[in-house]
Protein backbone atom coordinates (compact mmCIF):
# COMPACT_ATOMS: atom_id res chain seq x y z
CA UNK A 1 0.00 0.00 0.00
CA UNK A 2 1.12 3.57 -0.72
CA UNK A 3 2.73 5.18 2.37
CA UNK A 4 0.28 8.08 2.39
CA UNK A 5 -2.71 5.76 2.11
CA UNK A 6 -1.32 3.73 5.01
CA UNK A 7 -1.13 6.93 7.07
CA UNK A 8 -4.73 7.79 6.18
CA UNK A 9 -5.77 4.29 7.24
CA UNK A 10 -4.02 4.78 10.57
CA UNK A 11 -5.66 8.18 11.02
CA UNK A 12 -9.14 6.78 10.37
CA UNK A 13 -8.66 3.80 12.67
CA UNK A 14 -8.12 6.12 15.63
CA UNK A 15 -10.38 9.08 14.78
CA UNK A 16 -13.64 10.30 16.36
CA UNK A 17 -15.82 8.33 13.92
CA UNK A 18 -13.80 5.09 13.86
CA UNK A 19 -16.68 2.99 15.22
CA UNK A 20 -18.92 4.22 12.39
CA UNK A 21 -16.27 3.41 9.81
CA UNK A 22 -15.98 -0.13 11.14
CA UNK A 23 -19.72 -0.82 10.85
CA UNK A 24 -20.38 -2.57 7.49
CA UNK A 25 -23.98 -1.31 7.38
CA UNK A 26 -23.04 2.38 7.56
CA UNK A 27 -22.44 4.00 4.17
CA UNK A 28 -22.50 7.78 4.74
CA UNK A 29 -21.25 9.99 7.57
CA UNK A 30 -21.87 13.74 7.61
CA UNK A 31 -21.12 16.74 9.83
CA UNK A 32 -23.38 19.80 9.50
CA UNK A 33 -21.25 22.18 11.53
CA UNK A 34 -22.57 21.01 14.88
CA UNK A 35 -23.85 17.41 14.77
CA UNK A 36 -22.72 14.20 13.13
CA UNK A 37 -25.27 12.01 11.35
CA UNK A 38 -24.80 8.66 9.63
CA UNK A 39 -26.79 6.51 7.22
CA UNK A 40 -27.34 2.93 8.35
CA UNK A 41 -28.83 0.57 5.77
CA UNK A 42 -30.84 -1.16 8.51
CA UNK A 43 -32.00 1.83 10.57
CA UNK A 44 -31.91 4.78 8.17
CA UNK A 45 -30.35 8.13 9.11
CA UNK A 46 -29.27 8.42 12.75
CA UNK A 47 -27.57 10.99 14.96
CA UNK A 48 -24.16 10.13 16.40
CA UNK A 49 -23.35 11.27 19.92
CA UNK A 50 -19.95 12.87 19.73
CA UNK A 51 -18.51 15.90 21.53
CA UNK A 52 -16.21 17.54 19.00
CA UNK A 53 -15.36 21.11 17.98
CA UNK A 54 -15.04 22.75 14.58
CA UNK A 55 -11.31 23.16 15.22
CA UNK A 56 -10.91 19.42 15.79
CA UNK A 57 -12.89 18.71 12.63
CA UNK A 58 -10.66 21.10 10.70
CA UNK A 59 -7.49 19.41 11.99
CA UNK A 60 -8.87 16.04 10.87
CA UNK A 61 -9.84 17.31 7.41
CA UNK A 62 -6.56 19.17 6.98
CA UNK A 63 -4.57 16.01 7.72
CA UNK A 64 -6.49 14.05 5.12
CA UNK A 65 -6.24 16.80 2.51
CA UNK A 66 -2.46 17.01 3.00
CA UNK A 67 -2.07 13.24 2.67
CA UNK A 68 -4.14 13.40 -0.54
CA UNK A 69 -1.93 16.21 -1.90
CA UNK A 70 -4.87 18.62 -1.82
CA UNK A 71 -5.56 21.94 -0.13
CA UNK A 72 -8.37 22.87 2.22
CA UNK A 73 -8.41 26.47 3.37
CA UNK A 74 -9.99 29.89 2.92
CA UNK A 75 -8.50 30.12 -0.57
CA UNK A 76 -9.37 26.47 -1.41
CA UNK A 77 -12.72 26.07 0.38
CA UNK A 78 -13.99 22.90 -1.35
CA UNK A 79 -12.34 19.55 -0.75
CA UNK A 80 -13.19 16.55 -2.93
CA UNK A 81 -10.84 13.58 -2.52
CA UNK A 82 -11.01 9.79 -2.82
CA UNK A 83 -8.84 7.33 -0.92
CA UNK A 84 -9.03 3.67 0.08
CA UNK A 85 -12.77 2.87 0.00
CA UNK A 86 -13.91 6.41 0.82
CA UNK A 87 -14.89 9.64 -0.88
CA UNK A 88 -14.67 12.82 1.19
CA UNK A 89 -16.34 16.14 0.39
CA UNK A 90 -15.83 19.08 2.74
CA UNK A 91 -16.71 22.77 2.70
CA UNK A 92 -14.66 25.46 4.49
CA UNK A 93 -16.32 27.83 6.93
CA UNK A 94 -16.31 30.85 4.59
CA UNK A 95 -19.01 29.06 2.55
CA UNK A 96 -21.14 27.48 5.28
CA UNK A 97 -23.26 28.68 8.19
CA UNK A 98 -24.98 27.04 11.16
CA UNK A 99 -27.35 29.33 13.08
CA UNK A 100 -25.44 32.32 11.74
CA UNK A 101 -22.04 30.97 12.76
CA UNK A 102 -19.31 30.16 10.25
CA UNK A 103 -18.71 26.41 10.34
CA UNK A 104 -17.04 23.55 8.49
CA UNK A 105 -19.06 20.71 7.01
CA UNK A 106 -18.17 17.38 5.48
CA UNK A 107 -19.69 14.24 4.02
CA UNK A 108 -17.76 10.98 3.98
CA UNK A 109 -19.07 8.18 1.79
CA UNK A 110 -17.92 4.63 2.42
CA UNK A 111 -17.88 1.90 -0.22
CA UNK A 112 -18.04 -1.82 0.42
CA UNK A 113 -15.09 -3.30 -1.46
CA UNK A 114 -15.21 -6.71 0.20
CA UNK A 115 -18.33 -8.31 -1.21
CA UNK A 116 -21.24 -7.96 -3.62
CA UNK A 117 -24.38 -7.07 -1.68
CA UNK A 118 -26.94 -8.29 -4.24
CA UNK A 119 -27.65 -12.02 -4.44
CA UNK A 120 -30.53 -14.36 -5.15
CA UNK A 121 -31.15 -14.43 -1.39
CA UNK A 122 -31.45 -10.64 -1.08
CA UNK A 123 -34.74 -8.75 -1.43
CA UNK A 124 -33.40 -6.46 -4.17
CA UNK A 125 -35.36 -8.41 -6.79
CA UNK A 126 -36.41 -11.98 -7.58
CA UNK A 127 -34.06 -14.84 -8.39
CA UNK A 128 -35.64 -15.18 -11.85
CA UNK A 129 -34.89 -11.56 -12.70
CA UNK A 130 -31.30 -11.90 -11.47
CA UNK A 131 -30.85 -15.07 -13.53
CA UNK A 132 -32.19 -13.24 -16.58
CA UNK A 133 -29.75 -10.36 -16.02
CA UNK A 134 -26.89 -12.84 -15.61
CA UNK A 135 -27.90 -14.38 -18.94
CA UNK A 136 -28.04 -10.88 -20.47
CA UNK A 137 -24.42 -10.02 -19.65
CA UNK A 138 -23.19 -13.45 -20.73
CA UNK A 139 -24.97 -12.72 -24.03
CA UNK A 140 -23.17 -9.34 -24.22
CA UNK A 141 -26.32 -7.24 -24.02
CA UNK A 142 -25.90 -3.53 -23.26
CA UNK A 143 -27.61 -2.38 -20.08
CA UNK A 144 -28.61 1.10 -18.90
CA UNK A 145 -29.32 1.35 -15.16
CA UNK A 146 -31.09 4.43 -13.79
CA UNK A 147 -32.17 5.64 -10.37
CA UNK A 148 -31.74 8.32 -7.76
CA UNK A 149 -28.65 8.78 -5.59
CA UNK A 150 -27.88 5.79 -3.33
CA UNK A 151 -30.59 3.62 -4.90
CA UNK A 152 -28.40 0.59 -5.63
CA UNK A 153 -27.14 1.33 -9.16
CA UNK A 154 -23.50 0.63 -8.33
CA UNK A 155 -24.28 -2.55 -6.40
CA UNK A 156 -26.22 -3.84 -9.40
CA UNK A 157 -23.25 -3.05 -11.64
CA UNK A 158 -21.00 -5.10 -9.35
CA UNK A 159 -23.40 -8.03 -9.53
CA UNK A 160 -23.51 -7.87 -13.33
CA UNK A 161 -19.73 -7.59 -13.71
CA UNK A 162 -19.35 -10.71 -11.61
CA UNK A 163 -21.63 -12.61 -14.01
CA UNK A 164 -19.51 -11.98 -17.12
CA UNK A 165 -18.12 -14.87 -19.14
CA UNK A 166 -14.67 -16.21 -18.30
CA UNK A 167 -11.78 -14.72 -20.29
CA UNK A 168 -13.69 -11.64 -21.45
CA UNK A 169 -11.96 -8.26 -21.35
CA UNK A 170 -13.68 -5.54 -19.36
CA UNK A 171 -12.68 -1.90 -18.88
CA UNK A 172 -14.26 -0.15 -15.88
CA UNK A 173 -14.27 3.66 -15.89
CA UNK A 174 -14.92 5.67 -12.74
CA UNK A 175 -14.11 8.90 -10.92
CA UNK A 176 -13.39 6.92 -7.75
CA UNK A 177 -12.37 3.35 -7.01
CA UNK A 178 -15.86 2.13 -6.10
CA UNK A 179 -16.09 -0.71 -8.63
CA UNK A 180 -12.59 -2.10 -8.11
CA UNK A 181 -13.51 -5.12 -5.98
CA UNK A 182 -12.73 -8.83 -6.14
CA UNK A 183 -14.52 -10.34 -9.13
CA UNK A 184 -14.27 -13.60 -11.04
CA UNK A 185 -10.51 -14.01 -11.39
CA UNK A 186 -10.92 -15.48 -14.89
CA UNK A 187 -12.31 -12.19 -16.25
CA UNK A 188 -9.70 -9.70 -17.52
CA UNK A 189 -10.63 -6.44 -15.77
CA UNK A 190 -8.90 -3.06 -16.06
CA UNK A 191 -10.02 -0.07 -13.95
CA UNK A 192 -9.41 3.45 -15.27
CA UNK A 193 -9.83 6.35 -12.83
CA UNK A 194 -10.13 10.02 -13.80
CA UNK A 195 -7.45 12.51 -12.77
CA UNK A 196 -8.86 16.03 -12.97
CA UNK A 197 -5.55 17.50 -11.84
CA UNK A 198 -4.14 16.22 -15.14
CA UNK A 199 -7.34 17.23 -16.98
CA UNK A 200 -8.21 13.58 -17.69
CA UNK A 201 -11.96 13.19 -17.39
CA UNK A 202 -14.56 10.49 -18.07
CA UNK A 203 -14.84 11.47 -21.72
CA UNK A 204 -11.09 10.96 -22.20
CA UNK A 205 -11.18 7.57 -20.51
CA UNK A 206 -14.16 6.31 -22.51
CA UNK A 207 -12.23 7.08 -25.71
CA UNK A 208 -9.09 5.49 -24.25
CA UNK A 209 -10.97 2.34 -23.24
CA UNK A 210 -11.72 1.50 -26.88
CA UNK A 211 -8.00 1.00 -27.50
CA UNK A 212 -8.00 -1.84 -24.97
CA UNK A 213 -10.15 -3.93 -27.32
CA UNK A 214 -12.77 -4.65 -24.62
CA UNK A 215 -15.78 -6.93 -24.77
CA UNK A 216 -17.50 -4.65 -22.25
CA UNK A 217 -17.03 -1.02 -21.22
CA UNK A 218 -18.50 -0.35 -17.78
CA UNK A 219 -19.00 3.35 -17.02
CA UNK A 220 -19.76 3.71 -13.31
CA UNK A 221 -21.94 6.74 -13.93
CA UNK A 222 -22.59 8.93 -16.97
CA UNK A 223 -22.96 12.52 -15.80
CA UNK A 224 -22.37 14.45 -18.99
CA UNK A 225 -21.09 14.40 -22.54
CA UNK A 226 -19.22 11.11 -22.00
CA UNK A 227 -22.55 9.33 -22.50
CA UNK A 228 -22.32 10.17 -26.20
CA UNK A 229 -18.95 8.39 -26.37
CA UNK A 230 -20.44 5.33 -24.67
CA UNK A 231 -23.18 5.35 -27.27
CA UNK A 232 -20.59 5.71 -30.03
CA UNK A 233 -18.63 2.74 -28.68
CA UNK A 234 -21.77 0.62 -28.92
CA UNK A 235 -21.85 1.41 -32.64
CA UNK A 236 -18.52 -0.44 -32.82
CA UNK A 237 -20.10 -3.54 -31.32
CA UNK A 238 -18.73 -3.02 -27.81
CA UNK A 239 -21.25 -3.80 -25.09
CA UNK A 240 -21.72 -1.47 -22.13
CA UNK A 241 -23.13 -1.33 -18.62
CA UNK A 242 -23.77 2.27 -17.62
CA UNK A 243 -25.71 4.13 -14.95
CA UNK A 244 -27.39 7.52 -15.00
CA UNK A 245 -29.41 9.56 -12.54
CA UNK A 246 -33.13 9.71 -13.31
CA UNK A 247 -36.17 10.68 -11.22
CA UNK A 248 -38.42 7.91 -12.52
CA UNK A 249 -38.53 5.03 -14.97
CA UNK A 250 -40.45 7.23 -17.41
CA UNK A 251 -37.60 9.76 -17.59
CA UNK A 252 -34.73 7.34 -18.36
CA UNK A 253 -34.72 7.92 -22.13
CA UNK A 254 -35.26 11.66 -21.79
CA UNK A 255 -32.37 11.90 -19.33
CA UNK A 256 -30.09 9.90 -21.67
CA UNK A 257 -31.05 12.15 -24.59
CA UNK A 258 -30.24 15.25 -22.52
CA UNK A 259 -26.75 13.88 -21.81
CA UNK A 260 -26.10 13.39 -25.52
CA UNK A 261 -27.35 16.91 -26.27
CA UNK A 262 -24.94 18.59 -23.84
CA UNK A 263 -22.42 19.06 -26.65
CA UNK A 264 -24.85 18.46 -29.52
CA UNK A 265 -27.83 20.72 -28.95
CA UNK A 266 -28.74 20.67 -32.64
CA UNK A 267 -29.05 16.88 -32.86
CA UNK A 268 -32.58 15.73 -33.52
CA UNK A 269 -34.38 14.42 -30.41
CA UNK A 270 -35.98 11.48 -32.20
CA UNK A 271 -32.71 10.51 -33.89
CA UNK A 272 -30.94 10.32 -30.52
CA UNK A 273 -33.85 8.40 -29.01
CA UNK A 274 -33.82 5.85 -31.82
CA UNK A 275 -30.05 5.42 -31.50
CA UNK A 276 -30.34 4.76 -27.76
CA UNK A 277 -33.13 2.24 -28.26
CA UNK A 278 -31.16 0.56 -31.03
CA UNK A 279 -27.95 0.06 -29.07
CA UNK A 280 -29.18 -0.61 -25.52
CA UNK A 281 -30.91 -3.93 -24.93
CA UNK A 282 -32.13 -3.48 -21.37
CA UNK A 283 -33.35 -0.52 -19.30
CA UNK A 284 -33.46 -0.90 -15.51
CA UNK A 285 -34.80 1.40 -12.83
CA UNK A 286 -33.85 0.95 -9.16
CA UNK A 287 -35.28 2.74 -6.13
CA UNK A 288 -34.39 3.45 -2.53
CA UNK A 289 -37.48 2.97 -0.37
CA UNK A 290 -37.58 4.33 3.19
CA UNK A 291 -39.77 2.17 5.43
CA UNK A 292 -42.03 3.47 8.21
CA UNK A 293 -39.39 2.55 10.80
CA UNK A 294 -36.73 4.55 8.92
CA UNK A 295 -34.92 1.51 7.54
CA UNK A 296 -33.91 1.49 3.88
CA UNK A 297 -34.71 -1.02 1.16
CA UNK A 298 -33.23 -0.90 -2.32
CA UNK A 299 -35.21 -2.59 -5.05
CA UNK A 300 -35.26 -3.12 -8.80
CA UNK A 301 -38.68 -1.76 -9.74
CA UNK A 302 -38.60 -1.69 -13.55
CA UNK A 303 -37.02 -3.92 -16.18
CA UNK A 304 -37.58 -3.19 -19.85
CA UNK A 305 -36.31 -5.32 -22.72
CA UNK A 306 -35.93 -3.40 -25.98
CA UNK A 307 -37.38 -5.31 -28.93
CA UNK A 308 -37.26 -3.66 -32.37
CA UNK A 309 -36.80 -0.24 -30.77
CA UNK A 310 -39.70 -0.65 -28.32
CA UNK A 311 -39.13 -1.04 -24.54
CA UNK A 312 -41.22 -3.99 -23.31
CA UNK A 313 -41.92 -4.23 -19.56
CA UNK A 314 -40.73 -7.57 -18.18
CA UNK A 315 -41.98 -7.24 -14.59
CA UNK A 316 -45.41 -8.52 -13.59
CA UNK A 317 -47.04 -5.73 -11.51
CA UNK A 318 -48.88 -8.32 -9.40
CA UNK A 319 -45.99 -10.63 -8.52
CA UNK A 320 -43.00 -8.33 -9.19
CA UNK A 321 -41.47 -11.29 -11.02
CA UNK A 322 -40.22 -11.88 -14.55
CA UNK A 323 -42.75 -12.02 -17.41
CA UNK A 324 -40.74 -14.59 -19.34
CA UNK A 325 -43.48 -15.00 -21.96
CA UNK A 326 -42.74 -11.46 -23.22
CA UNK A 327 -39.16 -12.35 -24.08
CA UNK A 328 -38.54 -13.29 -27.75
CA UNK A 329 -38.92 -17.03 -28.32
CA UNK A 330 -35.30 -17.71 -29.29
CA UNK A 331 -33.97 -16.07 -26.12
CA UNK A 332 -36.73 -17.63 -24.02
CA UNK A 333 -35.71 -21.12 -25.16
CA UNK A 334 -32.10 -20.42 -24.18
CA UNK A 335 -33.23 -19.21 -20.76
CA UNK A 336 -35.35 -22.30 -20.22
CA UNK A 337 -32.47 -24.55 -21.27
CA UNK A 338 -30.36 -22.88 -18.56
CA UNK A 339 -32.95 -23.65 -15.91
CA UNK A 340 -34.95 -20.42 -15.70
Residue ranges and their predicted role:
Residues 150:
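Walker A (P-loop) phosphate-binding loop of P-loop NTPases
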Residues 145-147:
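Hydrophobic anchor at the beta1->P-loop junction of P-loop NTPases
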Residues 159-277, 287:
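Switch/coupling sub-region of P-loop NTPases
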Residues 142:
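Walker A (P-loop) ATP-phosphate-binding motif of ABC ATPase nucleotide-binding domains
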Residues 39, 43-139:
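P-loop NTP-binding catalytic core
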Residues 1-46:
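N-terminal anchoring/assembly modules that precede and organize ATP-driven motor systems
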Residues 153:
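Conserved lysine of the Walker
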Residues 1-20, 292-340:
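NTP-binding/hydrolysis catalytic cores, primarily Walker-type P-loop NTPases
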Amino acid sequence: MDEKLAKIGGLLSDCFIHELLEDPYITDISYNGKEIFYLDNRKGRCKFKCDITNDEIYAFLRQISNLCDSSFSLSQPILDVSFLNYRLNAVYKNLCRKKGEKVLTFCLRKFNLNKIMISEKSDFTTSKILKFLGFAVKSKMSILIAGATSSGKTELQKYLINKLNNHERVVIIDTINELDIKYNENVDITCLITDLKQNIDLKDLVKLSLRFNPDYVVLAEARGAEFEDVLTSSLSGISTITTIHAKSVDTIIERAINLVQINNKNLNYETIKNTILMHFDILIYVEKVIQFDGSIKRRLTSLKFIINGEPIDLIDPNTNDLLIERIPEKIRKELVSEGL
